[in-house]
Amino acid sequence: MANYTAADIKALRERTGAGMMDVKKALDEANGDAEKAIEIIRIKGLKGATKREGRSTAEGLVAAKVAGGVGVMIEVNCETDFVAKADKFIQLADKVLAVAVESGAADIETLLATEVDGKPLSEVVVEEGAILGEKVVVRRISRLEGGTVDAYLHKTSKDLPAQVGVLFAVDGEGEAAATAAHDVAVHIAAMAPNYLTREDVPADLVESERRIAEETAKAEGKPEAAMTKIVEGRVTGFYKGEVLVDQAFAKDAKKSVAQVLEEAGVKGTAFARFRVGS
């Protein structure tokens, strides 16, 4: 006769995130000892971890937090959207974010090497992934500080955690700075710029766009006298698509992002945008 109850099974499932049959088998093997059963579940899960190494991790979530004027954002990946919305996975991401905030880590290597309860965070992630039955990867981290930093998370599906996250920093403080930082962070989530200013765009990319614009204009039979103006116009169009401050502001297309920031008396200093799997 089993020396555990349905309540024990439920409690262990909540603690581990494992399936009902896996929990029952572990409790049977552990003779009803919950702590031993957890160890069994972990061991069995870790045995399968090597088989999961080559699997794709295209699902997951983005988590972010601003504390003490410092913004931190992470992307944590898993294999399926089923696990991405599981409480256990979300709790793991929250744990990783907390470690990222507290440790001051600014890169993945440093973050994963940070000790949590006597072991590297990387081991904690593997163990939790084993319980979930999927490969789990902490893919990237961003850390911004100085002035005012806003963190914005966007859900692309009501059934999933945030799939898009943004950190945006401006060089001022106060209510106007905070409002502008937030509004532009929301804009970044929607419009996905790749660069903060024109100076940040690699020169070879600009030259490539210029050559393409010129060749296209020639192929279209544009007059030579107007070529310079046409090419510069198309390069400007490229900037308006790729450069944050040149983009038309999402909330009011009559203004550029640069104008919105100028009206608030601030300048953007840095941004990061994560989208799960991209």
From Swiss-Prot:
Superkingdom: Bacteria
Gene3D superfamilies associated with the record: 1.10.286.20, DNA helicase RuvA subunit, C-terminal domain, Elongation factor Ts, dimerisation domain
Gene Ontology cellular component terms for the protein in this record: cytoplasm
Keywords: Cytoplasm, Elongation factor, Protein biosynthesis
Stretches of the chain forming a coiled coil according to its record: none
InterPro entries, per the entry: EF-Ts_dimer_sf (IPR036402), Transl_elong_EFTs/EF1B (IPR001816), Transl_elong_EFTs/EF1B_dimer (IPR014039), Transl_elong_Ts_CS (IPR018101), UBA-like_sf (IPR009060)
Pfam families: EF_TS
Major location (coarse): cytoplasm
Compartments reported by the entry: Cytoplasm
Keyword Mitochondrion: no
Involved in Mg(2+) ion dislocation from EF-Tu: annotated segments: 80-83
This protein's record includes keyword Nucleotide-binding: no
Gene Ontology terms, MF aspect: translation elongation factor activity
HAMAP family listed in its UniProt record: EF_Ts
Role according to the record: Associates with the EF-Tu.GDP complex and induces the exchange of GDP to GTP. It remains bound to the aminoacyl-tRNA.EF-Tu.GTP complex up to the GTP hydrolysis stage on the ribosome.
Similarity comment: family membership: Belongs to the EF-Ts family.
Protein name, per record: Elongation factor Ts
